[in-house]
Amino acid sequence: MLDPKLLKEKPQVIRDMLKARAVDFDLDGLIESDQKRREFIIKTDEFKKRRNEIGNEIAQKKKAGEDTSTILDEMKNVSAELAKLESQQEEIESKYAKLAFTVPNLVHESVPVGPDDTANKEMRKWGEIPQFDFKINDHIDMSENLDLVDLERAAKVAGARFYYLKNDLVRLNQSLIHFALDFLAEKEYSLVQPPYMINRSSMEGAVIADDFEEVIYKVEEEDLYMIGTSEHAMAAMHSKEIIEGKDLPIRYAGVSPCFRKEAGAHGRDQKGIFRVHQFDKIEQFVYARPEDSWKEHEKMLAVAEEFYQKLEIPHRVMLLSTGDMGKISAKTYDIEAWMAGQNSYREIVSCSNCLDYQARRLKIRFRDKTNEDTQYIHTLNSTLVATTRVLVSIMENFQTKDGHIKIPQVLQSYMGNQKEI
């Protein structure tokens, strides 16, 4: 949700953003409903004021023993008109809210303008692409050869894009989680295991409704949705709160399973564990002062880069274009890991600054002193590790000639000093 002052004072800023994002949005309708909303607020306030005045006059007349029939008629007329205005105002507010909650976020000036991922900008690379003197396998074949994943039985009990992790891949998955939590705890992140389901108002605060309804699972006959990431729950964690400025920044490390419909995935991604409906993820989430949020954004990215350097996974950092990044983000970096079996880089991290967009929707503010005005806080989020995708990268990049998988050195202590699968 954008600052309403922009609609009134700088609508061209929003028009420029919509053009850069190539988004079809009824901005004129939003501006018009905002103007009408303001007008109705003034009108209803005037009628409420008059109603209170009449109420006082009635009390005085009754106390003085005077006739109140005429003024009671006026009270009846004013109350009826007020009820009519409030009904109209409710309709206008509903239209305004629907549009205000779907307009995308502003875009940082450094973001490349383009229609899709072809306009993304490579910022840097790390690590050497592994070279093999033998025919390599992708993770799907390796999973079958080493009995690490059972896709057929998962499809039987749950459908496509589910899986059973088995044997040492279960341990490797858990080692990634434990290493990630230790890594963030050392950097003074507070560890959080959130609810795996949240209500609609919380989900709408964290994500644009049209977007989440396409990818998030709804719990039937309940006001609950399965989280697609712990970001959703952590964004809503401080909803309707005023945070003390001295406590900022707040850095959370969220650990949770994630549930996504992943509609539209095709090709090789329909098999294996790269693109699935359920996976484990460790997420960075930060509440920051407005003046600090861009610094925090770069810091979160650096934390994620360091994590993959420790895992010795070759990767690159991409700055997403206006056509490829999410609507709630003002700027997004992706980290893409090298997948040897696919001979390409694939996304494993998304790191975004949402400015005050989520905070306005969720009513999260901060203040420095008790008697000072409050400000909307800035929220930022970044994947640290979505384990199934990183398992794919490890399986493909660390495979050996005899068909085994070398365990990254930093994870060996989490697996009883085991060196290979």
Curated annotation (Swiss-Prot):
Keywords: Aminoacyl-tRNA synthetase, ATP-binding, Cytoplasm, Ligase, Nucleotide-binding, Protein biosynthesis. PROSITE patterns: AA_TRNA_LIGASE_II. Pfam families: Seryl_tRNA_N, tRNA-synt_2b. GO terms for biological process: selenocysteine biosynthetic process; seryl-tRNA aminoacylation. It is found in: Cytoplasm. Its EC number is 6.1.1.11. GO terms for molecular function: ATP binding; serine-tRNA ligase activity; tRNA binding. L-serine binds at T229, S230, E231, E283, T383. It is an enzyme of class 6 (ligase). It catalyses: tRNA(Ser) + L-serine + ATP = L-seryl-tRNA(Ser) + AMP + diphosphate + H(+); tRNA(Sec) + L-serine + ATP = L-seryl-tRNA(Sec) + AMP + diphosphate + H(+). One of its GO terms (cellular component) is cytosol. ATP binds at R260, K261, E262, V276, E347, I348, V349, S350. Pathway: Aminoacyl-tRNA biosynthesis; selenocysteinyl-tRNA(Sec) biosynthesis; L-seryl-tRNA(Sec) from L-serine and tRNA(Sec): step 1/1. Homodimer. The tRNA molecule binds across the dimer. Catalyzes the attachment of serine to tRNA(Ser). Is also able to aminoacylate tRNA(Sec) with serine, to form the misacylated tRNA L-seryl-tRNA(Sec), which will be further converted into selenocysteinyl-tRNA(Sec). Consists of two distinct domains, a catalytic core and a N-terminal extension that is involved in tRNA binding. Belongs to the class-II aminoacyl-tRNA synthetase family. Type-1 seryl-tRNA synthetase subfamily. This is Serine--tRNA ligase. It comes from Nitrosopumilus maritimus (strain SCM1). The lineage of its organism: Archaea, Nitrososphaerota, Nitrososphaeria, Nitrosopumilales, Nitrosopumilaceae.
